[in-house]
Amino acid sequence: MKFDVCVPILGFENVKEVTLEKIDDAFMRMESSNDEHISFTLINPFALREYDFEIPDATQKLLEIDEKSNILILNIAIIQTPVEDTVVNFIGPMIFNTDNNKAAQLVLSESTKYGVAEKISLYLKK
């Protein structure tokens, strides 16, 4: 599924369109449509922890989100070996409106309870 990027991905401002591909129930791959060398592994944060935040009105307008919209929230993960060393960026979620194929990265306030590089091992069941 292709998405137009309405709010740039930090550090990748030239990425204007991405393709989202399911890997499994928790992970997805997001790749730049213009540059196959730019790709990210994304994770469903709700598979790991409680995760909630408000999407600002300005972002809702850009993505044309309303109360009926189907949205997908994913976070960038840096996969490591062993997998327990993988880190997740909970402070910069990707928001996808699957109704109109628009996407944005949202940067949460630094006062949030979420981190930029939290080890996945903190949330894996032992």
Curated annotation (Swiss-Prot):
Keywords for this protein: Bacterial flagellum biogenesis, Chaperone, Cytoplasm, Translation regulation
Record text on subunit structure and interactions: Interacts with translational regulator CsrA and flagellin(s).
Location of this chain's protein in the cell: Cytoplasm
Location (main, coarse): cytoplasm
Pfam families, alphabetized: FliW
Identification of the protein by name: Flagellar assembly factor FliW
InterPro entries registered for this protein in UniProt: Flagellar_assembly_factor_FliW, Flagellar_assmbl_FliW_dom_sf
Domain of life: Bacteria
Example of a GO cellular component annotation carried by this entry: cytoplasm
NCBIfam families in UniProt: PRK13282.1
Role according to the record: Acts as an anti-CsrA protein, binds CsrA and prevents it from repressing translation of its target genes, one of which is flagellin. Binds to flagellin and participates in the assembly of the flagellum.
Gene Ontology process terms (BP): bacterial-type flagellum assembly; regulation of translation
SUPFAM superfamilies: BH3618-like
Similarity comment: Belongs to the FliW family.
Species: Sulfurimonas denitrificans (strain ATCC 33889 / DSM 1251)
